[in-house]
Amino acid sequence: MARNVLESSLLGAGFSIIFQILCRILTFGINAYIVRHVGREVLGIMNVRLLLLESTLLFLSREAINRAALSANAQQGDRCSWAQLINQMWLTVPICAVLCAPCLYIWLNWLSAVDAIYASQYEFACYAVAFSCVLELMAESAVFVAQVFCFVKLKILLNTLHILVRSAIFLWIVTGDRSAAINAFAIAQLSSAVTIVLGQYGFFYFYLKGFKDFVTQQAKKKPVAPKAWQVSLYEHMDDFPFKQLSDFLPGVMFNPNGKHFNRELQTLTLSFVKQGVLKQILTEGEKYVMSVSPVLSFGEQATYDVVNNLGSMAARFIFRPIEDSSYFYFTQTLSRDIKLAKQPQERVRQASSVLNNLLLGVSSIGLIAFTFGQSYSYPVLLLYGGPDFVAGGLPQSLLQWHCLAIYLLAVNGISEGYMFATNTSRDIDKYNYLMAIFSVSFLVLSYILTGIFGPVGFIFANCINMLSRILYSTYYIRHQYRPLSLDPLLGLWPGKLFGCTLFLAGIVCYWYQSSDLATHLGVGVLAGLACLLSWALAHRDLVRLAWRYGRRIKIE
C-alpha cells in the first residue's frame, strides 16, 4: 500500500473545510429564513430537540465502533481481518434500532412538551428521525472502507449531495406551506438518509467493475496506458480486498480467521463506548439540560442555538475537519501499545511536528476569534437576525462569551484527539472515570450557572469543562514526549509578534465600536490583515510547508 496517510489527511481536512463552509452557509441561510418568517419556536423544536435525537442515536451507535475499527485496521491488520471489520461496522444498525425505543419514549413522553399545534408534527418527526438514523447506518461499512482507502473526494461529494437534497426538499415544502415546517424537516431527513445509502453503494458498484477491468488490463503483456482518472482511482490499490458489492454485507466476505468478530476489537470498542456516552453528554450537555428541565422556552432555545451555531462556525468549518483528519493520521502513524521510544523515530518526530503545527494553527485561529468577537458580535447578529433578534442584548452577550469557548474548543479538539488516538485500552478505561466526573460536573455547573447568569451560564460551564480536559490531555502529551526531548506543546504559544498585534488590534476595534458600521468593518478588515501578516512573518516555515502541500493538492 503506497497511499500517503499524511497527505490524504491534509487533503481530507482541506476538502472538508470547504464543504463545511458551503453547507453551513446554506444552513445558516435556512435558519435565518425560519427566524424571520416561520418563528423561533419551530426553529427550537427542529434544531435543538430533533437534531439532538439524531445526534444521540448516531453518536452512540457508531462513534465507538468506528474509532476502534480505524485503530484495529492500522495496528492489528494481521490479527483482524476485513471480514471481521465489516461485521463489526454492521453492528451499528441493530444497536441503533435498539436505542430508538428508549430514545423515542423519552423524547415523546419525558421531555418538556411542545405546543399542541405542533404536537402531531413533532411526533411524526421523532419517528422519521429515528428511522433515518437506522437507514443511514446501513451504509456505514461502505463509509468506513472509503475512509480507510482514502476516498476523500467521495466523502465530500456525497456529503454535499445529501445536504443539498435535504435543504432543497425542506425549502420546497416550507415555501408552499409554512405551517408544515416540522413535517418538512422530517421528510428532508429521510430523503438525505436515502441519498447517503444510494450514493455510497452506487459508487462502489461502479468502482468494483472499473477496478476489475483495470486489473485485468494491466495484467496483459502489452497493457494499454491507463487514463489519468483511472490512475487516480485504481493505482496503489493492491491491498483492496473487495471483489463484489455483496462483500460489504455482513457474513458474506471470506474470513481467513474463521471467527465473525475479533475479541481485541470488541474490547477496544467497549472502551470507546464508555467514553462515547460521556463525550456525548459533554458535547450536547446544554441541549440535554434545556430539554429535560424547563430552563428556557423553545424560542429562547432557538436564540441560544442560533448564537451557538454562529459562535461555532470556526469549530464546524475548520476545527472538526482538522480534528477528524488528525485523529486518522495519528492512528495510522503511531501504535497504541508501544512506547514512543520503541517506535520508528522518524514517524515519532513527524507526529510530534504535526501535533505542534496543529496546535499552533488552531490556537491562532481561536485567539483571532476571541479578539475580534468582542467588537463584532453585534453587527454580525444584526445582519443575521435583524433588529428584533438582537434586542435586549442577550444574543450579543452570548456570542462574545462564546468566542472564549472557541479558543478552548480548538485546543481541546486537537490535544484530546491525539490522546484518544494513542491511548491504550487500559488508558482509555482510566480516562473514562475522569470523563464521568467531567460529565456530571458539567451538567451540575450548567444547571447552577444558568440559574445565576441565564443562558450565558451554559457557556461558562462549557469553558470550565474544556479547560479541565485540556489540562489533562496536555499533561499526557508532555509526559509521553519528555523522554524523547520533544515538546509539541510549544505550538500552544503562537509567538510574541502575533500576540502583541492581536492585543493592539483588539483595542483599536473596540475603540471604533461606536463608529458607523462601514468604518467599524473597514477597521476590522485592516486589523485582521495585520494579524495575519504578523502570524505569517512569525511562522515562515509553516507557511512555506502549507504552500507546498497546497500546490500538490491543486496539481492532483
Swiss-Prot record:
Q: Which residues form a coiled coil?
A: none
Keyword Endoplasmic reticulum appears in the UniProt entry: yes
Subcellular location as annotated: Endoplasmic reticulum membrane
List keywords of the entry alphabetically: Endoplasmic reticulum, Membrane, Transmembrane, Transmembrane helix
Extract the Pfam families matched here: Rft-1
Pathway stated in the Swiss-Prot or TrEMBL entry = Protein modification; protein glycosylation
Which residues span the membrane? 10-30, 41-61, 91-111, 129-149, 156-176, 184-204, 353-373, 389-409, 440-460, 461-477, 489-509, 517-537
Gene Ontology terms: biological process: dolichol-linked oligosaccharide biosynthetic process; glycolipid translocation; protein N-linked glycosylation
Q: How does it sit in the membrane?
A: Multi-pass membrane protein
The answer to keyword Membrane applying to this record is yes
The cellular component terms of Gene Ontology attached to this UniProt record, alphabetical and capped at eight, are:
endoplasmic reticulum membrane
Q: Which family does it belong to?
A: Belongs to the RFT1 family.
Summarizing the function annotation, the protein's role is: Intramembrane glycolipid transporter that operates in the biosynthetic pathway of dolichol-linked oligosaccharides, the glycan precursors employed in protein asparagine (N)-glycosylation. The sequential addition of sugars to dolichol pyrophosphate produces dolichol-linked oligosaccharides containing fourteen sugars, including two GlcNAcs, nine mannoses and three glucoses. Once assembled, the oligosaccharide is transferred from the lipid to nascent proteins by oligosaccharyltransferases.
Q: What is this protein called?
A: Man(5)GlcNAc(2)-PP-dolichol translocation protein RFT1
Task: Recall the taxonomic lineage recorded for the source organism.
Answer: Eukaryota, Metazoa, Ecdysozoa, Arthropoda, Hexapoda
